Amino acid sequence: MNDWHRIFTQNVLVPPHPQRARQPWKESTAFQCVLKWLDGPVIRQGVLEVLSEVECHLRVSFFDVTYRHFFGRTWKTTVKPTKRPPSRIVFNEPLYFHTSLNHPHIVAVVEVVAEGKKRDGSLQTLSCGFGILRIFSNQPDSPISASQDKRLRLYHGTPRALLHPLLQDPAEQNRHMTLIENCSLQYTLKPHPALEPAFHLLPENLLVSGLQQIPGLLPAHGESGDALRKPRLQKPITGHLDDLFFTLYPSLEKFEEELLELHVQDHFQEGCGPLDGGALEILERRLRVGVHNGLGFVQRPQVVVLVPEMDVALTRSASFSRKVVSSSKTSSGSQALVLRSRLRLPEMVGHPAFAVIFQLEYVFSSPAGVDGNAASVTSLSNLACMHMVRWAVWNPLLEADSGRVTLPLQGGIQPNPSHCLVYKVPSASMSSEEVKQVESGTLRFQFSLGSEEHLDAPTEPVSGPKVERRPSRKPPTSPSSPPAPVPRVLAAPQNSPVGPGLSISQLAASPRSPTQHCLARPTSQLPHGSQASPAQAQEFPLEAGISHLEADLSQTSLVLETSIAEQLQELPFTPLHAPIVVGTQTRSSAGQPSRASMVLLQSSGFPEILDANKQPAEAVSATEPVTFNPQKEESDCLQSNEMVLQFLAFSRVAQDCRGTSWPKTVYFTFQFYRFPPATTPRLQLVQLDEAGQPSSGALTHILVPVSRDGTFDAGSPGFQLRYMVGPGFLKPGERRCFARYLAVQTLQIDVWDGDSLLLIGSAAVQMKHLLRQGRPAVQASHELEVVATEYEQDNMVVSGDMLGFGRVKPIGVHSVVKGRLHLTLANVGHPCEQKVRGCSTLPPSRSRVISNDGASRFSGGSLLTTGSSRRKHVVQAQKLADVDSELAAMLLTHARQGKGPQDVSRESDATRRRKLERMRSVRLQEAGGDLGRRGTSVLAQQSVRTQHLRDLQVIAAYRERTKAESIASLLSLAITTEHTLHATLGVAEFFEFVLKNPHNTQHTVTVEIDNPELSVIVDSQEWRDFKGAAGLHTPVEEDMFHLRGSLAPQLYLRPHETAHVPFKFQSFSAGQLAMVQASPGLSNEKGMDAVSPWKSSAVPTKHAKVLFRASGGKPIAVLCLTVELQPHVVDQVFRFYHPELSFLKKAIRLPPWHTFPGAPVGMLGEDPPVHVRCSDPNVICETQNVGPGEPRDIFLKVASGPSPEIKDFFVIIYSDRWLATPTQTWQVYLHSLQRVDVSCVAGQLTRLSLVLRGTQTVRKVRAFTSHPQELKTDPKGVFVLPPRGVQDLHVGVRPLRAGSRFVHLNLVDVDCHQLVASWLVCLCCRQPLISKAFEIMLAAGEGKGVNKRITYTNPYPSRRTFHLHSDHPELLRFREDSFQVGGGETYTIGLQFAPSQRVGEEEILIYINDHEDKNEEAFCVKVIYQ
């Protein structure tokens, strides 16, 4: 509730001039105004001399030139410091508003305000000038549409000068206005239609900043924080209210009697003549209910009719209107006003500033005139008037989803959302003795959020009580009749529009105008056809539904009812695209190398891995099961683990026989544990002489490091790197986590082509064999399948893949084995030093309780030093410029007083002048032998002595002035505690601070934090769970903190009481951690230094400060946190290739929850809740449950950048409600590529050209493609790309198969091995018409192949040349790739079928193309391998 009151009180608007409110209403127009910078010496020199620390800001207000009236609310920019001399002041602040007063005389006044401190320390604010910003042109219906920069001229004086009667429009041409020379404000003003969907959240004529948080709008994406540039509405929540009871004390009868008596007295005192109190009657008791966001009503409030509690059963037979004075016949004993119907509020939003406003109104009327005679219906309508008597506000966020609520009613002169006078609250001046001693009344109701069922709802219909008219009253007017008279309204009109079927008060009653005070005074008639107050139309363009409509609804009332569209209810989410199942892209099989491969590896001369005793490490089999004993790992005497990764060989598989080129060089990327992501150097693939033809499991190529000149190193082959994981790296208690990481996690390795920079594939290896289990060293050799994964487009894999409600099978993901990686992993144990071992045995719980007992305290000494205690009593002279530069500069001001403040020497000048003075005195002393110079020396010494006396006086005055500040800053060290946290991405670091009240009096301590990533744990259950996970046994207190909305939490401390304040630090930002990737810090086999994660200075460090302020505002404790961010564990890596400057939408399906590492055994029942967070705020990442018992999907929506940008971010998944420890951490890479769409025919050549744009320097480049058999480029080899030039790259595409798929094309700098450009060629290929079909049976297995022949007849009368192609070049070869045949002649085509290793069927297409490579015919050969 505090949020609503705060926003409501801070955004009170001054309404436009009443004459503007009477004009016809027009549609509101939205604008965006960007105040860029201020040029020129706006701030006078005299102001800069009088004030210190001068700052500047702008103020913007609306002004009506016609009526000389300021309205709306003054908006202020952020304060910017000024420089001497004044130069350009940059603001760059966006300003938004919308208004329907599109008249040229409606302008915005921009005022330049300077503020600074006077000599006595008080703050002084001065107006330095103003400008008139014209919003609309001379044509009222045409706003300024130019969006280019404009300059606003500034005038001397303040905007209050516009109120002077001598200033006539145009004010800019008035002789009393004086321009400020060479001063202007740069700005842009343009319409902003994107703000129209948020009009209901922003009142008209309200100036708001794009950086301001608007209740009902989602925060902006990115770092700009401008939520109004593209507003995004929050999801609404439907609320229902039932059984509303208004209780007015001491009773409803007494309350209404006194209300009528006071109305009669007020009527007589205002000089309107006597009025019989018995003749005044209550027509209706109405309730207005609306949703308010602190700025204004979101929709026009609903209007319903209340009835006395005792009259509920009589409303169908008795008349509703009655005379209050006859209490014996009506409401005797009635204690409450009741609403029988249900209220539906579909515009609620889950925001602390959204509240429901209840307004209780009474409609009065007198059936007799002033002279006592019967009045006509017209006079009755004129005498009707409505008054608000009570109101209440309720914030649903503070309650549960359903329940009963009791609210106190408010009244009196305090501000309310309708900005009108309210009947006063009970006071001592009341005439009734019972009213004096009771409250203002209460409101009780039952509520439910997001539910359509009634809560204890009555059996009557939802519609309100039917109103029966008296026979003497005239029926309501028809829609064609002129509207009833409506009094003038200045602020927040509440009258409902006239329509058929409404009650009599709906036709005649309206809110009382502040300019009319007499109840019986008739208002002036509105002319026929004119509209009511336009302010009500501009604030509420649609009338809310009214519950007291009669049964005979006419067409107008039906339009009223249907104009308020109900909010559509969201159905359970069902994905239409195929999600990626976690694990499918890294399902490479791993095994142990064969004995033949081991012979080749051993004979190649790879370095041997030795333990600490220089003995070979124990070799374990990668296929043997591993028994993990955590106690055995922790009790190991070798506390340090040296992790060794040896990349040995990369072999080609026999299945990869499509004619694709084999890479010459490769490099690997991966991330091990919390170490920075690693990228190995380029390694040469050297073919073994003994390898021969590739077969299943055969070793073909070994890895050799490449030197700088491009040749491979003749030394030992392979590449080796080491990671040292010891007590110096691991945090206290982290060793068990590292052992569990080795036991359950897999290491994913990406293999890249070192020349084309294309991804070859990925491999995954389990690390459980690295657990030493008490052994000195272990090593395991692995043979890993390198798998390439391709993701099809979502629109290609939709149909036919739905398995049930919310289920999609993992289609659209194709994997191909590209090769086999031979890798050796080893773990070598080392003993650690004794001092390091001592710090590693610190219990984890000790570091989670921070006490200020050991804080440094001031121990005396100079105030100019750092205050640190010295063990040795040694006083060493220091340079004054080093100790206090300000004092050193002051000591030299006497010599330059006449040159102005701009010539004050700097620190270096002060030091240099002092040295010159000392040198001069030394030379004068050396010349003491000369009698003539001796007198000069004496005069110089006297001058120096006089100068020293002056310096001492300046020093004494300066020390006296800064003594209080220096003492206070040094004494604050006594209450300051410093602590260092080692945080990881997504992990909540929990700790407690022991706070003690050092005073003899109780205090309410406010906890102020300057870092949003650090927060106080205010939920006791969350505190309890964190303590249980950390193993702390300190007490937990319920309701420890007093929460005040968005303000800082408070807690109460008794004298000398100690309390444990719980904190948690959690960071989801990984922006600077990406810098660590540039310096992996790897070491090869020749440099055996282990990798240390702290060698790189790119590891970011954050700081947070917590201030504990007592009741008087003085701090009693200060906690300074230094947060050292550490690299984190990555469980899964995803790589997506997507067209540039578009959105990637992907769904990643989670496997069953019990299969995740670390899940409890037997957890097969209800899955825990899944929460997801992303390190990039510009990425939309969410999770939804598809249905009961269905799997969960993680949805990503990422905007790709320009090509060839690579965007990486982390997705963090939690399974606990407090988001304490991530269950999974994924790293997602998005490669932005230039998209090229190609529609072609299989087997036929399609040509296109790509434009290459040169960079700043000359580059030698080459084009590489992922499918060289299907896509060829011209130039084919290396060519020169001129600087800043344009060159064409010719591309020929011949797809071998029909279908849709992606082909990657990279342009690489061959000298620097950098990616210059990259394209994503999207092929949409159709199959040609098959003219002939053949069938052949072949034997599977080893063989020489089979030769066959088919004939082809030239259908043309002339001689033609034809070219032959096949969609399976590895299975079918032609005797001749092209042939010539005469017109009408027949040619025999020779075919050679290669043997196949597996049994099955294969359809091979033969494409016969003409001389232009267009398809003439296509044959299909069905091969059956037996």
From Swiss-Prot:
Its main location: cytoplasm. Keywords: Cell junction, Cell projection, Ciliopathy, Cilium, Cytoplasm, Cytoskeleton, Disease variant, Leber congenital amaurosis, Nephronophthisis, Nucleus, Phosphoprotein, Senior-Loken syndrome, Tight junction. InterPro entries: NPHP4 (IPR029775). Residues 474-486 have a biased composition (Pro residues). One of its GO terms (biological process) is negative regulation of canonical Wnt signaling pathway. Residues 823-1426 are annotated as: Sufficient for basal bodies localization. One of its GO terms (molecular function) is structural molecule activity. One of its GO terms (cellular component) is cytosol. Residues 450-536, 896-935 are annotated as: Disordered. Residues 503-536 have a biased composition (Polar residues). Expressed in kidney, skeletal muscle, heart and liver, and to a lesser extent in brain and lung. It comes from the Eukaryota. Interacts with NPHP1. Interacts with NPHP1 and RPGRIP1L/NPHP8; NPHP1, NPHP4 and RPGRIP1L are proposed to form a functional NPHP1-4-8 module localized to cell-cell contacts and the ciliary transition zone; NPHP4 mediates the interaction between NPHP1 and RPGRIP1L. Interacts with IQCB1/NPHP5; the interaction likely requires additional interactors. Interacts with RPGRIP1, CEP164, JADE1, PALS1, INADL, PARD6A, INVS, DVL2, LATS1. Interacts with INTU; INTU mediates the interaction between NPHP4 and DAAM1. Interacts with SPATA7. Belongs to the NPHP4 family. It is linked to Nephronophthisis 4: An autosomal recessive inherited disease resulting in end-stage renal disease at age ranging between 6 and 35 years. It is a progressive tubulo-interstitial kidney disorder characterized by polydipsia, polyuria, anemia and growth retardation. The most prominent histological features are modifications of the tubules with thickening of the basement membrane, interstitial fibrosis and, in the advanced stages, medullary cysts. Ciliary dysfunction leads to a broad spectrum of disorders, collectively termed ciliopathies. Overlapping clinical features include retinal degeneration, renal cystic disease, skeletal abnormalities, fibrosis of various organ, and a complex range of anatomical and functional defects of the central and peripheral nervous system. The ciliopathy range of diseases includes Meckel-Gruber syndrome, Bardet-Biedl syndrome, Joubert syndrome, nephronophtisis, Senior-Loken syndrome, and Jeune asphyxiating thoracic dystrophy among others. Involved in the organization of apical junctions; the function is proposed to implicate a NPHP1-4-8 module. Does not seem to be strictly required for ciliogenesis. Required for building functional cilia. Involved in the organization of the subapical actin network in multiciliated epithelial cells. Seems to recruit INT to basal bodies of motile cilia which subsequently interacts with actin-modifying proteins such as DAAM1. This is Nephrocystin-4. It comes from Homo sapiens (Human). The lineage of its organism: Eukaryota, Metazoa, Chordata, Craniata, Vertebrata. The gene is NPHP4.
